[in-house]
Amino acid sequence: MSHRRSTVKGSLSFANPTVRAWLFQILAVVAVVGIVGWLFHNTVTNLNNRGITSGFAFLDRGAGFGIVQHLIDYQQGDTYGRVFIVGLLNTLLVSALCIVFASVLGFFIGLARLSDNWLLRKLSTIYIEIFRNIPPLLQIFFWYFAVLRNLPGPRQAVSAFDLAFLSNRGLYIPSPQLGDGFIAFILAVVMAIVLSVGLFRFNKTYQIKTGQLRRTWPIAAVLIIGLPLLAQWLFGAALHWDVPALRGFNFRGGMVLIPELAALTLALSVYTSAFIAEIIRAGIQAVPYGQHEAARSLGLPNPVTLRQVIIPQALRVIIPPLTSQYLNIVKNSSLAAAIGYPDMVSLFAGTVLNQTGQAIETIAMTMSVYLIISLTISLLMNIYNRRIAIVER
């Protein structure tokens, strides 16, 4: 009986590792809760002392300032909530453009690093070593102040067949206007794609069963080109083009690619493509050389070997670090505030914060946007990575 009591007493003593672990965890939780409570109380007290009301009611108030680029309709008197949407769309736009351009450029630069051509290999190496070792902010300044801002003014703009004009105020290009046959055109395009994909799959199945290869692309080309043209002939033009024209000291009509967007896209695309190129090179070199020899022994030409044998296997190595580069693009897009591009940081965490004083709300919303975008990219890339992963039986 006494032995049982001493055992229970010993198990509840501080010398017991389990007791110490639980005690330390409880103390840590109490400390964290206390710090959070102190921060909350301190924040509320400071806001009350300064007469700042918390909450998101400010989103319904009028902004009172213009925005040079907006993908949706925006007027100077629109609300701060609409400013938030404009900044979000501008951030998504520059992130998407940079991801596409950096991926394409990095892919070809990475292939050039493995080329048998000495000059091409050295030029790609120089490209990578230069652009990945210069801070992205300096590259943004270079493209914006040293290149784009030194272009001629609107009256001396560089013209391309009087359809597009390049000046220090941006690139003006014709903008599409929806016509009467737009819906019919879209339906025709979708139908052509569906029929072409079905035809490719049917011919692939036929080739597997019989060993005979049927040429699919001529019929697919006729479908993709012919059906939309037929829809336009029957229902009218799908699009009309608004061509920019010089009016006074600037161009009117069309759409404009502002210098800030161009500089940001160029800088981040070039900067990130240098890292992606090294990822592509490492991924290709990670594929066993026996795969190259096996494809060569089957008589496959180098482009086919690369496209159908090497790249599919290299993707398993490429995708994880490539995801990190895509996330870096989204986060580096916040540098747009340095040259005045109206993204989330410049518009919402900058102008809106200064006008409303709602620092906690604006910063929290801005941080949440970047967090959600990053998590979405990670989720999509992880799903794709699992689809291409080798499944062991």
From Swiss-Prot:
Membrane-topology descriptor: Multi-pass membrane protein
Gene3D superfamilies: MetI-like
Compartments, as annotated in UniProt: Cell inner membrane
Domain of life per record: Bacteria
UniProtKB keywords: Amino-acid transport, Cell inner membrane, Cell membrane, Membrane, Transmembrane, Transmembrane helix, Transport
GO cellular component: ATP-binding cassette (ABC) transporter complex, substrate-binding subunit-containing; membrane; plasma membrane
Single GO MF annotation: transmembrane transporter activity
Purpose: Probably part of the binding-protein-dependent transport system YdhWXYZ for an amino acid; probably responsible for the translocation of the substrate across the membrane.
Protein name: Putative amino-acid ABC transporter permease protein YhdX
